[in-house]
């Protein structure tokens, strides 16, 4: 589970950084399409984190 924890933590920290960047873009009144693209990138990382949490759950809680 430790490797899963590290991977999930890394993904969530990446997502946090992306969301903070999006917030800064909004505050700076940046171009909407650029903001949307960054939001899509953040969503993709959150989806990966979601899948990793589910995979870890299946591997450790359901199967174990």
Regions found by a protein language model. Give the residues of each.
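Solvent-exposed interaction patches of small proteins and small membrane subunits
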Residues: 1-64
């Amino acid at each position: 589970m430790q490797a899963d924890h590290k991977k999930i933590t890394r993904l969530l920290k990446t997502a946090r950084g992306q969301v903070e960047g999006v917030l800064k873009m909004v505050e700076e009144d940046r171009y909407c399409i650029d903001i949307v693209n960054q939001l899509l990138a953040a969503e993709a990382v959150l989806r990966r984190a979601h899948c990793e949490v589910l995979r870890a759950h299946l591997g450790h809680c359901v199967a174990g």
